[in-house]
Amino acid sequence: TLVRIGPFCHGEIRNGGIPDWLYGRPFLIRTNDREYLKYVDRLYAEIASQLEGFFHKDGGCIIGIQLENELQHSAAPWAIRYPDQPIDYTVADYDVQNTKFGVSVQEQDIQSPEAGNQHMKTLKEIALSHGMEVPLYTATGWGNAAIIPQEVIPVTAAYTYPTWADIGMSPFYLFRDIHTTPDYSPVRYEGYRYPSFCAEMGVGIQMTYGRRPRIPAEAGEGLMVRSLGSGANGIGYYMYHGGITPQGKRGFFSDEPSGVPKMSYDFQAPIGEFGHTRASYHSLRIIHHFVNDFGHLLAPMGVVLPEHSDTITPSNTHTLRYAVRKKENAGFVFITNFQDHCKREDLRDVSLTLKLASETVRFPQDGTVTVVKNA
C-alpha cells in the first residue's frame, strides 16, 4: 500500500481535502507558514495514529507515502466564496498564476520553486516526527510540480480522456522515452536520475456535469502497453477501484464547483464503485501477470525506439506503433494499435527485424502478422 497523506489530496473531494474552516484565514495554505503547519502537524498526528501497526517497518503493508499532491501545479476550487466574486483556489497567493485545473503541461515558469520544494521537505519531516517512516516517499512529478530532490520518487501520470481539457487525440498512445523526457514535461527533475514510476494512469475518468466521456476497455490496455514500452517501471492507476464520496454533517464531500456527482466516484474504473469488474479489469490483469512474472527482467532495460518514431502523430492510423525494452542480448517488444477519439484500422503484413548485440531476430520468425485495430 502507498498512502497519500495530503494535506491537499484533491481526488475531486471538497476543497481538495482542505477543510472549509481554513478558508480566508490570515495565513497561506500549502506553504511553510507557521500557522498552517500547526494544522498539518495535527492532521499528520491523527493519520499516523490510524495507520499505527500497518507500516512496513512493523510488518504491515504500507511501503510508501505520497507527500501533498500536485504542489505548485494544480489546486481545487474552494467550495465556499463571497457572492459575485470569482472562484478562489486552494493555493498560496504566489502560486495563483501557475495553478492549473487538472493534470496538464505547465507552460509558465514557477514563481517560487524553492519555496515549494522546501515545503515538501518540511512535510516529510513532520511525517517522520509522527513515525510515518516508509521505504519509499513519492511526490507529483508532472507539470513542474514541487519535489524533494534525491529524497522522493517523482511519479508520473497520463490521462487520455481528461474532462478538464479540450477534446482531442491524446499523445499518450505514442511510444516515447518517458524515462528521459516524462509526460507532461517540463518537470522539476532530471528523469534519468529516477525510476519512471506511474501513479495516475487514467484507465477511467470521472464524469462531470458538462463532460461525460465513455472510455472503452481497449483505452486502458493500450495506455499501459505504451507506458511500459516507453520506460515505465511501475504501475499505478487513478482510479483502479471506484468509490463513493463520503457524507458529512452538512452534505457530501464532493467537489461540487467542478460539477462532479455528489455521491458516485465510480470513475469508470476497472473495478467499479460497488465492486463489479469491467472489461478493462480483465485486459489489464494480463499486463499485471506479465509485470509480476517478468518485471525483474524488464526493470533494468532501456528504451529503443524505431527510426522516425518522433514524427508519428496521434492521427496517423497506418504506421505501426512499437518500442523495445532491451538490455544486452534480450528484450521485450511492445506494440499497440489504439488511439482515442480516432477510428483505427487493422495493420496487415507486419514483421519486425531486431538487431541485437550478437544476432538479428525477426518477429515473427516466418511470415507476417496482422495487428488488429484497437489492440
Report residues per predicted region.
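Glycoside hydrolase catalytic-domain groove-lining segments
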Residues: 146-209, 223, 264-266, 271
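Short, hinge-like loop/turn segments at secondary-structure boundaries
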Residues: 18-23, 152-157, 253-254
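Short, solvent-exposed loop/turn and secondary-structure capping segments
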Residues: 6, 12-17, 75-80, 85, ...
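Outer-envelope exported proteins of Gram-negative bacteria
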Residues: 2-4, 62-64, 137-139
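Active-site-proximal helices and loops of the catalytic beta/alpha 8
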Residues: 86-169
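Active-site-proximal loop/short-helix segments
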Residues: 17-18, 63-94, 257
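Active-site-adjacent "subsite" loops/lids of carbohydrate-active enzymes
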Residues: 8-51
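Carbohydrate-binding surfaces of carbohydrate-active enzymes
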Residues: 25, 36-48, 58-63, 71-73, ...
